[in-house]
Amino acid sequence: MGQLKGLPVEDGFRMPGEYEPHIGCFMIWPERPDNWRLGGKPAQQNYKEVAVAISNFEPVTMFVSPNQYKNARKELPDTIRVIEMSNDDAWIRDYGPSFLVDDKGDMRGVDWGFNAWGGLLDGLYFPWDKDNQIAKKVCELERIDYYSQKDFILEGCSIHVDGEGTLVTTEECLLSEGRNPNLTKIEIEQTLKKYFHAQKVIWLKHGFYLDETNGHVDNIFNFVAPGEVVLSWTDNKSDPQYEISRECYDILANKTDAKGRTFIIHKLHCPDPVLITQTESEGVEAINGTFPRQAGDRLAASYVNYYTANGAIIFPLFDDPKDKDAQELLEKLYPDRKIVGIKAREILLGGGNIHCITQHLPDKSTIRE
């Protein structure tokens, strides 16, 4: 167990699709008062509901700061493992390890650099050093060897893979000045190919409208299966989201994946604009250097930000009539999985959603034929 030399692509490791079997799921308990209102109490209930829902299908581990351990242990059922781990916030998809597998049944991790979505240029908080240590800690906890790429800034929510050589990301995020400004698009793509074993990288221009992470791909796009994808959509041409989604659709419709397949694209309509209320804004402590939560600001509400569990899809609800439409489409797309909706407004208020707060651990014993 320890840090590896070499490259995953040379060692025969790939990043599996999220729909491939899992060993379990990791999460981090929310608490910071300058991002979560009322000291994180409402968000903790949403996180609890997500964790419990996932735990019905695969084991869940909740990491929690020392100050919150007793509270989290009391709130969460015994079926959920609770482990102390210092952190700066609760978005493990972004700074947890990227897990890789090979066809021999082995697993490895990648420890990327993290700078709170843009560092001192346009990051969302400072410091972020505790978050930047989590990937290594998780690999050591699970006794997984890992590659260290600390000089390359990458969040897990900024990429999606199909497990068969295709990776999708956005230019808005990976080419942002606050991440890897000294690297060209070609150099960034080469790194993605070397570490995820991707044969083809598809670049969307933008992520979801007003996504404060510079347009993470997981809020606008997801793989349902190899060659089949889902895209956040609106028919409202006066909504800025329309042009973004249309542009993404046109790019995908004119691309093939690494296997040469034309994409089957499903449109998952987003809810009507979700705005921060005055009460919600007042519940967040205003601290210099953190992203403000102002009454009337629009949130990046998207049903595409869901978690694919063993035998289930855990997706966000927004108290919108389109909740039902999203449920029905997901049931059609995933006939062999149970579709579970969770009220997720408090997660959304923090800047992300269900996919952002979860990190799956692939089942390394599943060898692809």
Swiss-Prot record:
GO terms for molecular function: agmatine deiminase activity; protein-arginine deiminase activity. It is an enzyme of class 3 (hydrolase). It catalyses: agmatine + H2O = N-carbamoylputrescine + NH4(+). The keyword Plastid does not apply. GO terms for biological process: putrescine biosynthetic process. Gene3D superfamilies: L-arginine/glycine Amidinotransferase, Chain A. It comes from the Bacteria. Its EC number is 3.5.3.12. Keywords: Hydrolase. Signal peptide: none annotated. The active site is at 356 (amidino-cysteine intermediate). Belongs to the agmatine deiminase family. PANTHER family: AGMATINE DEIMINASE-RELATED (PTHR31377:SF0). This is Putative agmatine deiminase 2. It comes from Listeria monocytogenes serovar 1/2a (strain ATCC BAA-679 / EGD-e). The gene is aguA2.
